[in-house]
Amino acid sequence: QNFIQNDVTKVVCWYLISSFYSIEPYHNVTVMVADSPWSGHYVVNPALWAYAHYGQFAKIGWRYLDGGCTNLAEGGSLVTLASGSDFSVIAETKGAKTNQQVNFKTAGGFSGKKLCVWRSNAKEQFVRLADLTSSNGEFIVTLEPDSIYSISTTSGQTKGGFSDIPPAVAFPFPYRETFDQYTQPELFGYLPRYTADITGGFEIAARPDGKGKCLRQVISAQAQNWGPEWMPYTIIGDRDWKDYEVTADVMPDGGGWAGVMGRISGTGSGWGCNPK
């Protein structure tokens, strides 16, 4: 649709892996979720294979063919990309109510080629179907509703995977952090494990009294953001904790102040939402 309606040839996924706490906005809209680094567990979301329908069937420099890009009569759309004597058709049928039979006619160097067919839907992703062979430069494909298809003259596609993904485990409890283990904090970008800054920037720093390290809020200027009234804060822990105690040694610097919150169940996104 981006190309058909607006001639857009590139879409940037603004982040690929969700490696932050589930109470933060947009937690599970990425292609992968890896939000428990203490366990090594991760989840591959079906969206990854939607990207594969492009990424494994075309390369940078391939061009869209205007004559092979269109909306489908019963819902969905398709685009065709080509390079040299190869081409790939990527079709989607979101919202379609019935199967659609699509007839393709090729010309020139595209005629007579063997075509691989791959499909993804909510039930199964990136499955190879029976190959097609064009006859007199023509081939027919039946597209099921709410599916993504790639039909291509290329080869070598595969669905990777890893069977030994560690199981998910809860955040370690009880938990204590002195930050003294970071003897070279610059190697970690001055960021400790497991904290997630919501507003401001919290970095590993020397304690004001010189007796070790601490976590220090280092951004002094107010950012121009969607939640201008928010105070700097960072989170750590598990949203499913029920009854617990939390303590912190606080060393205000230059007349500053600090606070400790518990049972944070949402961080807000700036759309009129406050931490609650």
Residue ranges: model-predicted function:
Residues Q1-E74:
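Aromatic/acidic polysaccharide-binding cleft in carbohydrate-active enzymes
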